[in-house]
UniProtKB/Swiss-Prot annotation:
Task performed by this protein: Involved in protein export. Acts as a chaperone by maintaining the newly synthesized protein in an open conformation. Functions as a peptidyl-prolyl cis-trans isomerase.
Matches recorded under InterPro entries: PPIase_dom_sf (IPR046357), PPIase_FKBP_dom (IPR001179), Trig_fac (IPR005215), Trigger_fac_C (IPR008880), Trigger_fac_C_sf (IPR037041), Trigger_fac_ribosome-bd_bac (IPR008881), Trigger_fac_ribosome-bd_sf (IPR036611), Trigger_fact/SurA_dom_sf (IPR027304)
Pfam families recorded: FKBP_C (PF00254), Trigger_C (PF05698), Trigger_N (PF05697)
PPIase FKBP-type domain segment(s): 166-250
A single GO BP: cell division
SUPFAM superfamilies tied to this protein: FKBP-like, Triger factor/SurA peptide-binding domain-like, Trigger factor ribosome-binding domain
Name of the protein this chain belongs to: Trigger factor
Record organism: Mycoplasma capricolum subsp. capricolum (strain California kid / ATCC 27343 / NCTC 10154)
Major site of localization recorded for this protein: cytoplasm
Protein family (similarity comment): Belongs to the FKBP-type PPIase family. Tig subfamily.
Ranges annotated as spanning the membrane: none
Length: 428
């Protein structure tokens, strides 16, 4: 027997190839022939007793080769297992006949490769720079305005009043391109907050200054990245503005703070300080996560991976499910998505597969770093995390422990430790 092997890395598979020829193959063919003859029933003869001249009519080469294949599989597989430095397999190999004749048989044993990573450098990577985080007054005002919106009042404007940014407008509209109404361009009693950017760029800005009344026109241009039938085209919308309401926000003062009833916050100055602190923490967290993701991408570039095809298929199934759920949530059909994005089904499939593979590679990289650096969550860190959740939800620690699995907390703590390790050991 002759042994050869090959890694099909792109497919996440490997194969052992065993060739049996010469006298050895002839012996297996003889065994196959004798086994077939012993069970062959030829009219006019007892089972297995027909002469060679008669059995030859029934024992075709295909039948003979198939029977010999059944006999030779085990010794061929056992021979492959004796080979030193053979590629390790992750599941039971599937035998496939590559070539067969009266002179030889060539069998491939195809299997999944063992999932593994040979990680590249994961410390002192300087190609990704750390950025500083700042909190502007606008950032603070935006958060406080969301608080104020909880207690906002609406006051109907006079018929003679103009629309201003922030107003709530009820109106009918109908859109035209080249003087032809288009699908999806019409609605009745639509309610819109001016400045919320629900419509295409320019639509809401064009409404500013209008008053209650019928047959008012505005002109917009659809973005280039839009439904192909409308992308980049000029459009006219005829509006019937029925009602304009002013959104009245409460003042930025201690009364607002009293209404919010936040723990340990009694003045507006304290509220601003808390918001600034919270925004800074969130921005810092997001900045850190983005930096770490970019570093992981750099590590992936210099690492070698061996990923079984079955694992890719399993991950791809999850990715496709997420994609389908997102479309459902956005109330968009797959066909409409392809029309909007101008990409084909083949491109979508390729993108989803690449996403699945990237997720697997990211998992392998972080798992390897975690193992190499012995990153583990201590009992103290786990208990501290439980206390954080208890404080967040305002319930007892023991109650939190009964609601959240200990392993889930352990995983979260270790993920945070790992993220901190990567952040502190890379970039400038």
């Amino acid at each position: 027997m002759i042994f050869a092997q090959e890694k099909l890395v792109d497919q996440g598979q490997g194969k052992w190839t065993v060739t049996i020829d010469g006298e050895q193959w002839i012996e297996f063919l003889k065994k196959a022939k004798n086994r077939l003859k012993a069970n062959l029933v030829v009219p006019g003869f007892r089972k297995g007793k027909a002469p060679e001249s008669e059995t030859a009519k029934y024992l075709t080469p295909i039948k003979l080769y198939n029977e010999a294949f059944k006999i030779v599989i085990k010794p061929a597989f056992d021979f492959a297992l004796t080979q030193e430095n053979r590629i390790q397999n992750d599941n039971s190999p599937t035998p496939v006949i590559v070539k067969v004749s009266e002179k030889e048989i060539v069998i491939d044993f195809v299997f999944d490769l063992v999932l593994e990573v040979k990680i590249g450098e994961y410390k002192n990577i300087s190609t990704i720079k750390k950025s500083t985080v700042e909190v502007s007054q606008e950032d603070v005002d935006n958060v406080i305005d969301m608080y104020r919106s909880r207690f906002a009042m609406q006051k109907e404007k006079e018929v003679s009043d103009q629309i201003q940014k922030g107003d709530i407008v009820t109106f009918d509209f109908k859109g035209y391109v080249d003087d032809q109404a288009f699908e999806g361009g019409e609605a009745k009693d639509f309610v819109l907050e001016i400045g919320s950017n629900q419509f295409v760029p320019g639509f809401e800005d064009s409404m500013i200054g209008l008053k209650v009344g019928e047959n008012q026109e505005i002109n917009v241009k659809f973005p280039e990245e839009y439904i192909p039938s409308l992308a980049g085209k000029d459009a006219k919308f005829v509006l019937n503005i029925k009602n304009i309401k002013e959104k009245i926000l409460p003042a930025k003062d201690d009364e607002l703070v009293k209404d919010l009833n936040l723990p340990d916050i009694t003045t507006y100055v304290q509220l601003e300080e808390k918001v600034k602190k919270d925004v800074l923490e969130q921005k810092t967290k997001n900045n850190k996560s983005e930096f770490v993701e970019n570093i992981i991408d750099e590590i992936i570039k210099t690492s070698e991976f061996q990923i079984p095809k079955t694992i890719v298929e399993r991950q791809l199934k999850d990715v496709k499910k997420e994609f389908e759920d997102q479309l459902t949530q956005q109330k968009i059909t797959l066909e409409k998505y392809k029309e909007i994005t101008k990409i084909s089904q083949e491109e979508i499939d390729e993108e989803l597969k690449n996403d699945a593979i990237h997720r697997i590679k990211s998992f392998l990289v972080v798992s390897e770093i975690k193992n190499k650096e012995n990153i583990k969550a201590s009992e103290e860190a786990i208990n501290t995390k439980f206390e954080e959740f208890a404080n967040l939800y305002g319930i007892e620690v023991e109650k939190i422990k009964s609601l959240i699995d200990n392993q889930a907390i352990k995983h979260q703590v270790e993920s945070e430790l790992l993220e901190t390790f990567i952040f502190e050991n890379n970039g400038n």
